[in-house]
Amino acid sequence: MIGWLEALLRVGRKLAAKTVTVQYPEVKPQLPPRSRGRIVLTRDPDGQERCVACNLCAVACPVGCIDLSKAVAEDGRWYPEHFRINFARCIFCGYCEEACPTAAIQLTPDFELSEWRRDALVYDKKDLLIAGEGKVRGYRYWSVAGKAITGKDKGDAEHEAPPVDLKGLRP
């Protein structure tokens, strides 16, 4: 008898408690600031695409959903000739964003990616490329790439071995 009464009281307390279900289409959920959603390709402050087709994002992807091929522009700069992401396979882990040296590939909080057909979840470069800079503002990869930092020659840092003289190592 007491067990039955305890169960009835427990049900009564749960009925009086506030519900936690969010009515999704009408009420948008509050997402954490670092939530990982849709992947985008960004541009630098000059309006050029940041991606240099280094293929690091495709190598870092644990499920292999990124496919790209490199092309060379007239000025010698690499750019992706085609860039595809299969969102049907993507697990939104963020490894591609971490691997990108130019901050070109970024994950946004947008999570509404449902489609009726799976082939519609394969996004091309034109679908991924956005007009803005994304989360990383003012970063110009080409202004810093390949340039030596002044005062940072080999052997100048604290607790660093002096440079090796290769010609002095002859037998």
From Swiss-Prot:
A single MF term (Gene Ontology): iron ion binding
Biological processes annotated in GO: aerobic respiration
E.C. no: 7.1.1.-
Domain 4Fe-4S ferredoxin-type: 39-71, 81-110
The keyword Metal-binding belongs to this UniProt entry's keyword annotation: yes
CC annotations in GO: plasma membrane
PROSITE patterns linked: 4FE4S_FER_1, 4FE4S_FER_2
Cellular location(s): Cell inner membrane
Cofactor dependency: [4Fe-4S] cluster
Keyword Plastid appears in the UniProt entry: no
UniProt keyword terms in alphabetical order: 4Fe-4S, Cell inner membrane, Cell membrane, Iron, Iron-sulfur, Membrane, Metal-binding, NAD, Quinone, Repeat, Translocase, Ubiquinone
Subunit field text: NDH-1 is composed of 14 different subunits. Subunits NuoA, H, J, K, L, M, N constitute the membrane sector of the complex.
Alphabetized NCBIfam families for the sequence: NuoI, PRK05888.1-1
Family: Belongs to the complex I 23 kDa subunit family.
Protein name: NADH-quinone oxidoreductase subunit I 2
Organism encoding this protein: Rhodopseudomonas palustris (strain BisB18)
